[in-house]
Amino acid sequence: MNAPVTAPPVNADNEKLAQRCEKIAESATAAIEWLDVAGEMVRDEGPAMARDFRRETLRARKLAAAARRPMCVSVFGPSQQGKSYLIASLARKGDALTMIRFGEEVRDFVADINPDGGKESTGLVTRFTIRPVIGLPGMPVACRMLSETDIIKIMANAFMEDFDRDTVTALEPKQIEEVMARMRAKAARDPVDRLTEDDVYDLFEYFERYFRNHPSHIALKPAYWREMETLAPRLAIPDRTELFGLLWNLTPTMTRVAVKLITALSQLGFPDEAFCPMAALEPKRSSIIDVETMATLGEDSTDRVPVATRMGQRADLERAVLTAIVAELQLQLADKPFDFFDHTDLLDFPGARTRGKESAQNAEREAAQNIFMLFRRGKVAYLYQRYLAEQELTSMLLCLKHSNQEVATVPFMVNDWIVSTHGATAEARKAHATTLFLVFTMFDVEFAQKAGQQDDSVERWSTRIETTLTQYLGKSPEHTWVHEWVPGQAFNNTYWLRNPAVRDEG
């Protein structure tokens, strides 16, 4: 079979950058500790200063981790936009098959791994890399895992985005205080596992950024959050999940499923990565890469998959649960398709989806019947937010097809990435090379002659550009990048993508 691809050496400059970021994090942590003993000097400004230093600590740690990871090209867009063809073209060498290495075994990605059918079918990020993916004996399938706070963010995202916020009745202070009082009585003296105060503060920062004006977040006053930072790490998983359940208005089914998923992570020691046998991907109809495998998430199942970590923890997890808690599937390409893989990985994101607008008055009934769909939509949306926060997305191939776009959140998601990587203004963006590539997919349809219409290609293609760029991506007044990417120039890094194997039979 094909010889293993040799990965490039670790970049020394990136390691130096990571170490500098770690020193910044250490200094910020030391500043927080100093504030604890310098109360008389800082007086009322102390809490605000501590929050600022904690924010910088988290940011520096994320930057350090990002510096050690390879650059990434992300393929992103709404569901059903033709991303699969682009991924297939980029992940194979010429006309060869896309072959994936699992230890000593090599498999065909399309035939053996990728879910069948034309529907949007993944609920995790797929990483294609030429770097060695080193598994465990008998467990060559490598996965990056969600964290406990990721689960909380996903569940709350599902509640806050899939239920109409105008129908949300915020919890009363008395209800919140009742929960807090019960948890105070249950709290241990010291933290019980890996959850830290910084983790809880990171939760607060997430909701401040994305859901600042949501009734469920507004109801949790800053004073509650400050107490939760010290209280949650001292609670057992069911209790602290109930505490965080305040974010989804204590909807019972959502809390129950969150406990189930976090408990699975705890059985593995809350790992950053875990490993499975090939059975996790077989048969294809129940592979963990197929989002439909999560359909039994709210039920008990005997279909289990063994999972292990490098630290020696092992557990047999329900297949639906494993599918839910995996963030990323890491696939090592047997052959290098293009030279950019020497320094860059290719990330295939699940397609963004239209969010539901159910009445929050029916939240428990909806969750009991459709927890799979709620968690699915929340996870797909959150994965993008996680990779954005972790500074992983160096470049983006944004795929949009010819029909009207219905996923209203995509323009805002793209704008967040642009602000983070290129800048919020045209003046700021001119200092950076453009790494956003707008790909008009399914261009084959533009060659089809429609009955009764003149063949005016210029008008037809201009209309498509206008519809996609101005009316969709640039509709919001906040999204000025469409009209002025750099001073005096609109965004123009656009490409047409067609499949040359498709012929116009008209």
Model-derived features: where do they sit?
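N-terminal low-complexity/disordered regulatory or targeting extensions
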Residues: 1-79, 92-336, 343, 506
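Conserved GTPase G-domain substructure that encodes guanine base recognition and part of the catalytic core
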Residues: 70-74, 89-113, 129, 162, ...
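Conserved glycine(s) of the Walker
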Residues: 82-86
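Switch II (G3) loop of P-loop NTPases
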Residues: 93-102, 108-109, 144-148, 341-379
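Residues that form or immediately flank small-molecule/cofactor binding pockets and catalytic motifs
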Residues: 133, 351, 499-501
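A Trp-anchored, charged/polar loop motif used as the substrate-binding/catalytic surface
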Residues: 315-335, 367-387, 416-421
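Short hydrophobic "helix-edge" motifs at membrane interfaces and signal-peptide entry regions
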Residues: 338-339, 431
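Structural motif
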Residues: 346, 397-398
